[in-house]
């Protein structure tokens, strides 16, 4: 592996002041920046009534404001060079809110709203957006999910443990980006919930009240 082809920069998504220096470092090293993949985030497993406000705020700071700050740091370079692509890994809950994920769902909805607006604003400047909506992928996201007091859940959800292989998910993501897709759903049967919500919102709401999503 040629070390000159890689640059590793640690970045705290809650440190907004670190975004511009990080973007400048990358631009100085490579001369340009073609894509930014927003994939950092934390999930949640707690009821609204039990969750500390500090937990709600932390989830929004990491999942939403972190992505916004990094986007604003990179956007001027995209415009100067005539374009670039933001790849935004959100979640099915960005369109399908589910119990025990209220702040997490809110953060993903916020990402959808922000990047759909950005897509329209900067289209003529060559800026493109790919929204990625994964379902149950076999990663550590549920293990590290925040509980009501801000501690980690510490265990993997059953549906996560039986979810899609992350390598397969990554390949589908790369394929979607290469094809210039505006949005891609990477999910198993849980993806059917999107169609149910569109065709029969009332039925979807009845179903989600009874389904145990773990």
Regions found by a protein language model. Name each.
Residues 124-188:
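SDR active-site lid
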Residues 49, 96-103:
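Active-site loop immediately N-terminal to the catalytic Tyr-X3-Lys motif
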Residues 47-48, 55-57:
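Substrate-binding pocket helix/loop in short-chain dehydrogenase/reductase
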Residues 91:
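Residue(s) in the substrate-gating loop at a strand-loop-helix junction
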Residues 71, 107:
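Active-site helix of classical SDR
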Residues 11-21, 53:
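The beta1-alpha1 cofactor-binding region of Rossmann-like NAD(H)/NADP(H)-dependent oxidoreductases
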Residues 96, 117-128:
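Active-site-adjacent segment of SDR/Rossmann-fold oxidoreductases
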């Amino acid at each position: 592996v040629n070390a000159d082809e890689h640059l590793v920069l640690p970045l705290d998504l809650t440190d907004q002041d670190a975004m511009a220096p990080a973007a400048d470092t990358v631009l100085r090293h490579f001369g340009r920046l073609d894509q930014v993949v927003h994939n950092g985030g934390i999930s949640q497993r707690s009821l609204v009534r039990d969750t500390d406000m500090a937990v709600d705020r932390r989830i929004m700071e990491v999942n939403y404001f972190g992505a916004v700050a990094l986007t604003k740091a990179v956007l001027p370079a995209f415009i100067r060079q005539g374009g670039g692509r933001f790849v935004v890994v959100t979640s099915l809950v960005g369109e399908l809110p589910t119990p025990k994920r209220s702040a997490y769902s809110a953060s993903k909805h916020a990402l959808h709203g922000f990047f759909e607006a950005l897509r329209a604003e900067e289209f003529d400047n060559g800026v493109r957006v790919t929204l990625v909506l994964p379902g149950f992928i076999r990663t550590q996201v549920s293990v590290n999910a925040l509980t009501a007091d801000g501690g980690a859940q510490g265990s993997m959800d059953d549906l996560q443990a039986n979810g899609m292989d992350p390598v397969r998910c990554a390949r589908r993501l790369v394929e979607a980006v290469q094809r210039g897709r505006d949005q891609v759903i990477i999910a198993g049967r849980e993806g059917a919930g999107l169609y149910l919500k569109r065709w029969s919102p009332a039925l979807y709401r009845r179903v989600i009240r009874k389904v145990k999503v773990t």
